């Protein structure tokens, strides 16, 4: 060990610790609280896109997200009316 190395300033570990904490917090949010927020946002966006083309009762739409070890699935169930009115002429 060199005497010069002893007096030099060590690299700050704060940026690394901050980055690790952010990754940990993002993971925790995704596995607990973030899922319901994401599903709510996806539901509203999906309804907005579908409403451009056909009239759908908002109460007859369900969106569910399941997370597994390897795969996450998003299930969307929409009850369409028998006479779907087209929004645009083809």
Curated annotation (Swiss-Prot):
Top-level taxon of origin: Bacteria
GO BP terms, alphabetized: cell division; regulation of division septum assembly
InterPro entries named in the record: MinE, MinE_sf
Family listed: Belongs to the MinE family.
HAMAP family with a match to the protein in the record: MinE
Keyword terms, alphabetized: Cell cycle, Cell division
NCBIfam families for this protein: minE, PRK00296.1
Keyword Cell cycle attached: yes
Function of the protein: Prevents the cell division inhibition by proteins MinC and MinD at internal division sites while permitting inhibition at polar sites. This ensures cell division at the proper site by restricting the formation of a division septum at the midpoint of the long axis of the cell.
The gene coding this protein: minE
Designated name of the protein: Cell division topological specificity factor
Pfam family membership, one: MinE
